[in-house]
Each structure stands twice: as C-alpha cells, then as structure tokens.
C-alpha cells in the first residue's frame, strides 16, 4: 500500500479514537469566517479544553463508521470542522453556540452527545445550559437555602429573646 493511503488510514484511526473518547462533539461549517474570527474561535475553544480541527468529510465519515456513530453522512458536506471534548459535555456546544450568535457565518451542522447524533437546535439548547461546575454550585445553593434560613430564624429568635429579657 502506498504511504499516502497508510497515512490517511492512520488519520481516520485518530479521528475515530477522538470521536469514541469524546463525551461531546459539535460539527460546524466555518465558511465565511475570517482568519481572525477562526483564530478567536480556536482560542475560546482551547480555553474551554475543547479540541477543534478541520478534517476532510470522507475521513470523518469513515471515522464515524469505525466509531459506530450513525447518521452523520447527511451533515458532512462543504467545509467541516469538528470540535470535541473528552471532559465537559457542555463546553463545545456552549462556546460554539455563543460564537455563532455573534458571528452568523458560523453554521452549526450537528452534534454528537455520548454516541448519539443530535440536531443543530439541540446543540444550541445544550450550549445554553450551565457547565457542570455551574450546575453543582446551583444544586449546593438550593440545598444550603433551608439550612441558612433556619439559622437566620434561630438567630432572630435569640435576638428577640435577648431584647425582651432586657
């Protein structure tokens, strides 16, 4: 086999491994973005711990097949960039959905969450959710509220008894 075909097979294996290991993947059409805008997007994604790469559609198609992900073929037309995260489910969707609001040229094609293909609208919905840390802090705040209110009530009763005793 020629060296080029072997290199392409290795690239497909790398993409397939990336798709298998990612908890969240967003596929976008970046056509119409300037170099500065793409650089800004890459920077934002890097800060969020998201890997962003441009791949040939044929390679992504073969990698998805190898990774056992079905339903991507119809979205793999035109320029395709893939954003993946192995840690935070919300990060790729959040960064890309936010960036797409500011830059209409960026088109969200589809996404993959834990092996299932989701629509562009679902990607935007996931992008509007708080991050894992944000959800945990919200939960803790909700759990703390009754205890905090009880402490305030006990303190108020104590102060009221002190005033009446004086």
Swiss-Prot record:
Biological process terms from the Gene Ontology for this record are: translation
Alphabetically list the UniProt keywords: Ribonucleoprotein, Ribosomal protein, RNA-binding, rRNA-binding
**SUPFAM superfamilies given in the database record:** Ribosomal protein L10-like
A single GO molecular-function term is:
large ribosomal subunit rRNA binding
Q: Which InterPro entries match?
A: Ribosomal_uL10, Ribosomal_uL10-like_sf, Ribosomal_uL10_bac, Ribosomal_uL10_bac_type, Ribosomal_uL10_CS_bac
GO CC entries: large ribosomal subunit
Similarity-based family: Belongs to the universal ribosomal protein uL10 family.
PANTHER family the UniProt entry points to: 39S RIBOSOMAL PROTEIN L10, MITOCHONDRIAL (PTHR11560)
Query: What job does this protein perform?
Result: Forms part of the ribosomal stalk, playing a central role in the interaction of the ribosome with GTP-bound translation factors.
User: What name goes with this protein?
Assistant: Large ribosomal subunit protein uL10
| The species this protein was found in | Staphylococcus haemolyticus (strain JCSC1435)
